[in-house]
Regions:
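Short, compact, well-ordered microdomains
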Residues: 71-108
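Conserved mixed alpha/beta catalytic, RNA-binding, or beta-rich assembly cores of soluble enzyme
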Residues: 2-63, 67, 107
Length: 108
């Protein structure tokens, strides 16, 4: 079971932004997860630079980017905790794969 408490102590995350028409997607993951693969039954998660990028950013950068995006993917405790702290994700909607929290957001 994953327990997320209090204000996050966010360190470095990888951020990558994609634009397709009016949609802006942000991919955010904890730096320590890059290049790793996680499995939990039928669920598989591969954290790769092709999707999450190679540019390290701070959680302040993540916070500044979120108001401009319409879709976001968060992987890892730091990224997910920050999204919860800012009100973009509800704790109840987190998926945990092999101990790694993941969440998605879509603005409608």
């Amino acid at each position: 079971m994953l327990i997320i408490q209090g204000e996050s102590q966010c360190g470095d995350v990888y951020l990558k932004t994609y634009r397709q028409g009016a949609e802006v997607l942000l991919a955010a993951c904890d730096c320590d997860l890059m290049g790793k693969r996680f499995e939990d039954g039928k669920l598989h998660l591969e954290v790769c630079s092709d999707f999450f990028g190679t540019e390290k950013a701070s959680c302040q950068d993540l916070e500044k980017a979120l108001p401009r995006v319409t879709i976001a993917n968060f992987v890892g405790k730091k990224a997910v905790d920050k999204a919860i702290e800012l009100g973009y994700i509800n704790k109840e909607n987190i998926l945990v794969i092999d101990g790694v929290p993941c969440a998605q957001m879509v603005m409608m």
